[in-house]
C-alpha cells in the first residue's frame, strides 16, 4: 500500500505557484504602465485645454485685432507718406520748370521788351474795362435782386426750405447714425453672445468629460473596493480554515493519545488475563477488546474520511488518493470487526483444551493483525499530519499574499483619492477663473456700452444746442431786419486795376 503523504504533483504545484507569482508581477507592471500612460494623457489634455482656452479668450481676440489694426495703420501711413512724397516730387519738378522758363526770359531784347509792355498795357486796359463792366452788371443785378419783392420772397422760401431740408438731413443722418450704432451694438452683442455660448459649450464639454472621468474612476475605485472586500473575505476564510486545520490537528493528536492509552490498557489486561488462565472468558474479553479497538479505528477513519470529503472542493486532485486509502482502511476494519463478532459467538462452545489451543492460535493472529493495523494507522495518521502541515503552510502563504495585496490596494486607493482631490481643486480653480473672465468681459462690455451711450447723448445734446443756437440767431436776425426795414446798401468805390 502506497503512502498517502507522498504527492506526485508537488513539483507541478511549485511551478504553478511560481507562474502565478510571475503573472501577478506582470499584471502589476502592466497596471503601473497603464496608470502612467493615463496620467500622461490627462496632463497633456490639461495643457491642451488650457492653451485652447487661452487662444480662444477675449484677450487673445483683442490682441489679434489690435495687432491687425496696427499693421493696417502702419500700411496706411506708409501709403500716405509715399503719396506726399510723390506730390512733393511733382511740385518740385513744376517749380524747377518754372524757374528754368523764368531764367530763359530774364534778358529779352529792346524790341521784344517794348512790344511786351504795349501788349501788357493793352491787356491791362481791356481787363480793367471788363472788370468795371462786370462789376457794374453785378451791382445792378444785386440791386435788382434785393429790391425785388418776389425774389426776396423766393429767397426767404428757399432759405426756409434749406433750413427744413437741413433739419431733415440732420434727422436722417441722426437716424442713420442711430441705426449704425444699434447695428454695431447688436453686432457686439451677437459677438459677445457667441463667445459666451462657445465658452459655456466648452465648459459644458469639459464638465461632461470631467464627470465621465470621475464616473470611470469611481467604477475603478468600486472594482478595487470589491477586490479589497474579496481579499478580506479570502483572508477571513483562510483564517477560519487555519483554525479548522489546527482543531483537526489537535483531534489527530488526541486520537493518537487515545490509541496509546488503549494499547497500554490492553497490555495490562493481557497480563492479568494470563495470570487467571481463564481462557474462555479471556477469549471473549479479548474478542470484545479487539472489537473495541477496531471500532475506535473505524471511528477515526470515518472522521478522517468525513474531513477529507469536506475538503474535496478545495483540493480534489490531491485528496482523492488519501480518501481512497481511508475508505479502504475503513472497509478492512469493518470486515475484521464482523469476523471478531463471529469468533466471539464461537467461543461459548469451546472446551478448555481447545480454548487454550484456539487462544494461542488466535492470539498469534490478533498480534499479527494488530501490528498490521498499527502500521497502517501510523501511515494514515502520518499522511494526515503531513497534509495538515502542507495545508497550514499554503494557508499561511495565501494569507501573507492576501495581506500584501490588501496593503497595495489600500495604498492605491489612497493615491487615487489624493489625485482625484487635486484634480477637483484644479478643475474648480479653472472654472472659477473662467467664470471670473466671463464676468470681467460682461463688465467691460457694459462699461463700453455705457460710454458709447454717454457719447451719443452728448453728441445729440450738442447737436440740439447748435440747432437751437442757429434757430435763435435766425430769429434774432429776422427781428432785426424787420425792425430796421429796407436799407439801401452802400457800395464802396471799385478799386483800380493798377492797385
From Swiss-Prot:
Residues 12-38, 71-133, 168-306, 359-484 form a coiled coil. Residues 69-78, 172-209 have a biased composition (Basic and acidic residues). Pfam families: TPH. Residues 46-78, 169-209 are annotated as: Disordered. InterPro entries: CFAP53/TCHP (IPR043596), TPH_dom (IPR043597). Residues 260-426 are annotated as: Trichohyalin/plectin homology domain. One of its GO terms (cellular component) is keratin filament. It is found in: Cytoplasm, Cytoskeleton; Cytoplasm, Cytoskeleton, Microtubule organizing center, Centrosome. Residues 74-499 are annotated as: Interaction with keratin proteins. Keywords: Coiled coil, Cytoplasm, Cytoskeleton. GO terms for biological process: apoptotic process. Residues 50-67 have a biased composition (Polar residues). Belongs to the TCHP family. May act as a 'capping' or 'branching' protein for keratin filaments in the cell periphery. May regulate K8/K18 filament and desmosome organization mainly at the apical or peripheral regions of simple epithelial cells. This is Trichoplein keratin filament-binding protein. It comes from Danio rerio. The lineage of its organism: Eukaryota, Metazoa, Chordata, Craniata, Vertebrata.
Amino acid at each position: 500500500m502506497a503512502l498517502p503523504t507522498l504527492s506526485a504533483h508537488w513539483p507541478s504545484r511549485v511551478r504553478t505557484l511560481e507562474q502565478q507569482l510571475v503573472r501577478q508581477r506582470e499584471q502589476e507592471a502592466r497596471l503601473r504602465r497603464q496608470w502612467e500612460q493615463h496620467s500622461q494623457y490627462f496632463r497633456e489634455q490639461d495643457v491642451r485645454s488650457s492653451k485652447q482656452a487661452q487662444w480662444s479668450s477675449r484677450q487673445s481676440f483683442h490682441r489679434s485685432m489690435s495687432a491687425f489694426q496696427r499693421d493696417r495703420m502702419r500700411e496706411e501711413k506708409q501709403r500716405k507718406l509715399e503719396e506726399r512724397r510723390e506730390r512733393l516730387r511733382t511740385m518740385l519738378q513744376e517749380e524747377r520748370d518754372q524757374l528754368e522758363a523764368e531764367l530763359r526770359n530774364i534778358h529779352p531784347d529792346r524790341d521784344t521788351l517794348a512790344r511786351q509792355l504795349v501788349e501788357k498795357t493793352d491787356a491791362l486796359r481791356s481787363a480793367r474795362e471788363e472788370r468795371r463792366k462786370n462789376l457794374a452788371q453785378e451791382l445792378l443785378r444785386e440791386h435788382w435782386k434785393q429790391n425785388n419783392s418776389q425774389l426776396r420772397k423766393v429767397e426767404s422760401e428757399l432759405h426756409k426750405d434749406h433750413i427744413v431740408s437741413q433739419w431733415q438731413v440732420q434727422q436722417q443722418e441722426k437716424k442713420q447714425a442711430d441705426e449704425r450704432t444699434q447695428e454695431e451694438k447688436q453686432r457686439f452683442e451677437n459677438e459677445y453672445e457667441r463667445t459666451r455660448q462657445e465658452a459655456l459649450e466648452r465648459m459644458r464639454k469639459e464638465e461632461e468629460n470631467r464627470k465621465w472621468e470621475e464616473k470611470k474612476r469611481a467604477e475603478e475605485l468600486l472594482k478595487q473596493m470589491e477586490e479589497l472586500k474579496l481579499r478580506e473575505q479570502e483572508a477571513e476564510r483562510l483564517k477560519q480554515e487555519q483554525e479548522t486545520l489546527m482543531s483537526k490537528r489537535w483531534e489527530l493528536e488526541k486520537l493518537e493519545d487515545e490509541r496509546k492509552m488503549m494499547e497500554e490498557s490492553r497490555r495490562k489486561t493481557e497480563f492479568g488475563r494470563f495470570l487467571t488462565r481463564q481462557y474462555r472468558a479471556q477469549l471473549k474479553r479479548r474478542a470484545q477488546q479487539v472489537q473495541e479497538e477496531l471500532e475506535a479505528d473505524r471511528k477515526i477513519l470515518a472522521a478522517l474520511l468525513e474531513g477529507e470529503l469536506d475538503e474535496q472542493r478545495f483540493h480534489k486532485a490531491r485528496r482523492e488518493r488519501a480518501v481512497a486509502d481511508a475508505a479502504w482502511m475503513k472497509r478492512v476494519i469493518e470486515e475484521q470487526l464482523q469476523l471478531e463478532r463471529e469468533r466471539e459467538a464461537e467461543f461459548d462452545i469451546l472446551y478448555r483444551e481447545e480454548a487454550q489451543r484456539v487462544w494461542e492460535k488466535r492470539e498469534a493472529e490478533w498480534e499479527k493483525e494488530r501490528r498490521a493495523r498499527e502500521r497502517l494507522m501510523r501511515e494514515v495518521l502520518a499522511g494526515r499530519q503531513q497534509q495538515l502541515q502542507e495545508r497550514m503552510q499554503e494557508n499561511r502563504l495565501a494569507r501573507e499574499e492576501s495581506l500584501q495585496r490588501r496593503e497595495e490596494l489600500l495604498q492605491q486607493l489612497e493615491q487615487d483619492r489624493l489625485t482625484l482631490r487635486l484634480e477637483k481643486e484644479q478643475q474648480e480653480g479653472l472654472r472659477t477663473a473662467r467664470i471670473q473672465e466671463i464676468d470681467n468681459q460682461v463688465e467691460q462690455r457694459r462699461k463700453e456700452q455705457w460710454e458709447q451711450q454717454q457719447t451719443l447723448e452728448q453728441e445729440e445734446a450738442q447737436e440740439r444746442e447748435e440747432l437751437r443756437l442757429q434757430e435763435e440767431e435766425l430769429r434774432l436776425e429776422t427781428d432785426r431786419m424787420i425792425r430796421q426795414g429796407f436799407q439801401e446798401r452802400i457800395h464802396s468805390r471799385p478799386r483800380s486795376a493798377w492797385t
